[in-house]
Amino acid sequence: MESIEHTKLKPLTIALAVSESYELLGVQVGTLPAKGLLSDLSQKKYGPRLDQSSQAVEKLLRSLKVSPTAKSFIVKSDSKPSYQKIVAEVFPSQFHETHIARENKEKRRELKYTQLEKKIFDPIFATNQRMAKLRDHIKRLTRRSWCTTKKLINLESHVYLFMAENNGYTLI
């Protein structure tokens, strides 16, 4: 998931781990360099920005508490190439499934006006649904808004508060 830090010239990455029961297991936030037409302007104005996407995912996966006696589990993600290497490194004995969202979109377009559209299975629905809920509940994540994150740590803290509320923790 991506967001911004004060301006589109300073994008952020948000690594999210979600269980099949929609429980948020962990979150990490990192910086990204600007992409496309904004990259030159971003370089001039703010200097080079590190791509912390892979580090955020690795830190998130390492922070997950997995019992040594736990049975095997399946790690599901989208098809970003760096995920395979990181998952294999952190969880060498676990199976990693990658899913291409583009295939699912094409199926939906083809079956738009038929009854079959409702039967299309999205294997990473839990993750996509939690990301949509995050964007809806945390206004600093909405795409076209003045409510932007000014500091990376504040965004991470806000997402942790959402995680606690989502998972049913009692806040004191």
Residue ranges of model-derived segments:
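Residue-level recognition of single "structural anchor" positions
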Residues: 1-172
